[in-house]
C-alpha cells in the first residue's frame, strides 16, 4: 500500500488554485482571439459548437454580456490579481478596437426602430447596456480608473452624449424604447447615474431623472401590497399577456434598485418611496423564513405568483434582488432590508445550490443565470457581513465551480453548460463575461481576492457599494 502518496484529490483548494484556474481560463479564451486592424475581439465559442450568436440580441462581438467589453473587464481583474502586464495589454487591445469602431446615434435608430430578429425580438434589450455601447463604456471607464488614460474617459463621455441624443421626447415622456427594465431603458438610467457620480456632470443626472420619472408614472398598486411594474410586454417572448417578472433583470426589484440609487444622488422622496414600495411587493409575495427566502419567478393578475418556479442567480433570483435590499439598507439603515438581504441569500443554499440543480438552477455556470453569479454574490456577502456563513458558502460554490470545469488541455480551462434553460441539450462553451467562461473565471478571481484581501474592479452591478 502506497501510504506515502497523498494525491492532490485529497487536498482542499487554496486561493492559489482559484487564481491559477482563472489564468488557465484566460489562456483558453486566447485560443479564440481574432486580431483586427485596430486591436482584438474574440469569437463567441469554438468552431463546431451549436451555440447562439447574432440570433440573440446580447451576443454581439463587442458586448459586455458575451463580447470583448465583458472579456476586457475580466482581463482587468486578472491584471489586478496577478500584476501581469500581459492581461492589461490584452484589455487595452480590446479597448482599441472598441474605440476605433465606436457607433453614433444611427446605431440606436437602427436597433430600436427596425425589426429585431432572432429568438429574443426585444428592441430595448438589443440596444441595452449588456449588448450595446453602454456596456462598452462600462469597460472603458474601468480601464480609465486603472490606467488614468484620458482616451478611455473620452469614449465614455461620447457614449453618454450619443445616448442622450438617441432619446426621444413624446407623449410618453423622455425614453429610448418601450421596454423599461434595467436590461433596457432602466439600465440607461443606471449608467447615467453612475457616470454622474464619477464625473459630477449634472446633465447626466438630469437625463436619468427625466427618464426615471416616466417609469415612476407606470408603477402599479399590487393586490399583495406595495407596487410593481409591468416593464415590458412579455408576450413578445411568448409568455402569457400581462405576465410580469418580480425580480431583478426584467422586474420590480431591479426597478426598485434603480430608484434607490437615484434617491441617493437626488434626495427626491418619491424615488425612495417607490424603491420601498417595490420591495414591499417583493417581500409580500416571497416564500420562506429567516433560514432562507425566495421571490417567485413570475406573477400574473389572474393566476398569481409562480409558487413552483424560482431562479437562484442574478437575472431572476436572489443574487440580483438582494442588490436592491442592500442598497436600501445602506440608504436608510432600516434593519429589515439587511435582514432580507441575508435571508434571500440563504434561500440560494436552502434550495440546494450550488450542488443541487432545480427548475431555475440548471446546468448553467454563468454570471447571469448560474453558478458564477452565485459565487460573485457570496464573495460580496462575506465582505458585506463578515459572517463565516457566507465565507463557507463562497468556498463551497468556488469548489463546485472548479470541479465542473474542463482542464484536459494542460494550461487551459473551460466550462460547458446550457445557457438556454428550455434547451438543456444545447451544451457549449461561450467565452463571455455574463454568459460564459470569462464570468466563471472572474468569480474565481473574486474569491481569490477575498481570501487574499485584494481589491478588484467590481462588476457594474456592484458599483453602488464602492
Predicted regions located by residue number:
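Glycan-recognition and catalytic cores of secretory/periplasmic carbohydrate-active enzymes
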Residues: 1-466
Amino acid at each position: 500500500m502506497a501510504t506515502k502518496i497523498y494525491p492532490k484529490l485529497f487536498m482542499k483548494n487554496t486561493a492559489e488554485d482559484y487564481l491559477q484556474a482563472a489564468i488557465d481560463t484566460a489562456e483558453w479564451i486566447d485560443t479564440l482571439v481574432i486580431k483586427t486592424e485596430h486591436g482584438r475581439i474574440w469569437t463567441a465559442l469554438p468552431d463546431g459548437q451549436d451555440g447562439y450568436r447574432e440570433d440573440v440580441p446580447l451576443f454581439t462581438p463587442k458586448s459586455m454580456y458575451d463580447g470583448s467589453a465583458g472579456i476586457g473587464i475580466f482581463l482587468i481583474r486578472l491584471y489586478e490579481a496577478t500584476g501581469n502586464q500581459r492581461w492589461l495589454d490584452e484589455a487595452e487591445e480590446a479597448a482599441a478596437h472598441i474605440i476605433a469602431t465606436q457607433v453614433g446615434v444611427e446605431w440606436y435608430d437602427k436597433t430600436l426602430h427596425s425589426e429585431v430578429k432572432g429568438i429574443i425580438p426585444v428592441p430595448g434589450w438589443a440596444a441595452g447596456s449588456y449588448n450595446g455601447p453602454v456596456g462598452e463604456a462600462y469597460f472603458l471607464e474601468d480601464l480609465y480608473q486603472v490606467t488614468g488614460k484620458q482616451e478611455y474617459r473620452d469614449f465614455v463621455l461620447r457614449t453618454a452624449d450619443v445616448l442622450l441624443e438617441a432619446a426621444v421626447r413624446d407623449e410618453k415622456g423622455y425614453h429610448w424604447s418601450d421596454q423599461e427594465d434595467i436590461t433596457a431603458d432602466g439600465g440607461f438610467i443606471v449608467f447615467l447615474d453612475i457616470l454622474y457620480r464619477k464625473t459630477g456632470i449634472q446633465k447626466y443626472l438630469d437625463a436619468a431623472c427625466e427618464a426615471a420619472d416616466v417609469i415612476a408614472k407606470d408603477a402599479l398598486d399590487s393586490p399583495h401590497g406595495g407596487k410593481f411594474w409591468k416593464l415590458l410586454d412579455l408576450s413578445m417572448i411568448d409568455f402569457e399577456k400581462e405576465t410580469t417578472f418580480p425580480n431583478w433583470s426584467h422586474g420590480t426589484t431591479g426597478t426598485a434598485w434603480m430608484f434607490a440609487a437615484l434617491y441617493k444622488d437626488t434626495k427626491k422622496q418619491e424615488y425612495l418611496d417607490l424603491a420601498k414600495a417595490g420591495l414591499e411587493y417583493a417581500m409580500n409575495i416571497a416564500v420562506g423564513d429567516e433560514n432562507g427566502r425566495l421571490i417567485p419567478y413570475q406573477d400574473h393578475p389572474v393566476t398569481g405568483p409562480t409558487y413552483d418556479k424560482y431562479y437562484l442567480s442574478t437575472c431572476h433570483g436572489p443574487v440580483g434582488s438582494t442588490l436592491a435590499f442592500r442598497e436600501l439598507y445602506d440608504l436608510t439603515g432600516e434593519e429589515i432590508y439587511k435582514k432580507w438581504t441575508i435571508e434571500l441569500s440563504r434561500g440560494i443554499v436552502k434550495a440546494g445550490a450550488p450542488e443541487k440543480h432545480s427548475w431555475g438552477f440548471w446546468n448553467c455556470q454563468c454570471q447571469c443565470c448560474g453558478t458564477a453569479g452565485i459565487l460573485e454574490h457570496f464573495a460580496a456577502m462575506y465582505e458585506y457581513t463578515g459572517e463565516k456563513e457566507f465565507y463557507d458558502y463562497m468556498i463551497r460554490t468556488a469548489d463546485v465551480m472548479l470541479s465542473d470545469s474542463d482542464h484536459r488541455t494542460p494550461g487551459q480551462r473551460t466550462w460547458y453548460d446550457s445557457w438556454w434553460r428550455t434547451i438543456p441539450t444545447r451544451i457549449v462553451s461561450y467565452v463571455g463575461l455574463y454568459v460564459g467562461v470569462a464570468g466563471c473565471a472572474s468569480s474565481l478571481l473574486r474569491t481569490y481576492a477575498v481570501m487574499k484581501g485584494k481589491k478588484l474592479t467590481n462588476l457594474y452591478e456592484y458599483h453602488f457599494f464602492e
